[in-house]
């Protein structure tokens, strides 16, 4: 079934997009980590925001390299990739990387919210004065969700492998006894790997909704803070572009970009779960898989554009790259 619908041009397109993602992911996240680490070594200190940014960039670097290694193992050692132990290990690695990528981005949004927003509420002031502890507590609480997620995925993964190995000719797509996400078939090994993450989608998406909800609440409360601040400025007859308003606006722009990318990512996951006919199309399958990497890579470049230090470092690097490119052209010609 899979081999009849698969077009090699789709696989070629996927390969091109995949390698572009790998290169841009390494460059973007590597740049964030390098700039912050060099600044840390130079100043002998690092801010909480830069700590979160650096950890986020390193996590996404690990994610990109793990995806690259898994794909290389698939093509170079397919017999090794088909082992249940390797199948489980790949799933756990992707879940852990995705978990920390999303939760660290959520922590960054909560940090900006507590630092920039202004309320007279006693609970808010208590959290604002202890923002570092709040971020640390969020990370620790997220570890509980991670353990639950891995445990749940372990049960699903073990079940799917047992079914696949126990009845090699059985097509789970046509079965009403199993969830529609089990799309394993014996027609192609590539199809097995391409659909392996869909075993995890229903449970994993539920855990992904938790940080999304936290980020959404922080975004709307920050927007409420900006609205109250704007009304206060109108009463005091001050200009609309004061420092607090600009800080609110920049944080809201970054938060909105994150939520938009996050919502698109979740939309593709939910679409993959609910639409069986859609999932039979290899183009949608491949696009669904690369959407996760696109989300993290796009958000990394949003962070670069939204951070003054990273943006300034980018502007200082670009002239050097142009000069090096001109030198290479001179050598060639």
From Swiss-Prot:
- Which stretches are transmembrane? 15-37, 58-77, 92-114, 134-156, 205-227, 251-273, 283-305
Q: Check the record and name the Gene3D superfamilies matching this protein.
A: Rhodopsin 7-helix transmembrane proteins
Statement: the UniProt record of this protein carries the keyword Glycoprotein: yes
**Expression sites (tissue/organ):** Expressed in subsets of taste receptor cells of the tongue and palate epithelium and exclusively in gustducin-positive cells. Expressed in the antrum and fundus (part of the stomach), duodenum and in gastric endocrine cells.
Q: Which SUPFAM superfamilies match?
A: Family A G protein-coupled receptor-like (SSF81321)
Predominant place of localization: membrane
Family, as annotated: Belongs to the G-protein coupled receptor T2R family.
According to UniProt, the name of this protein is: Taste receptor type 2 member 123
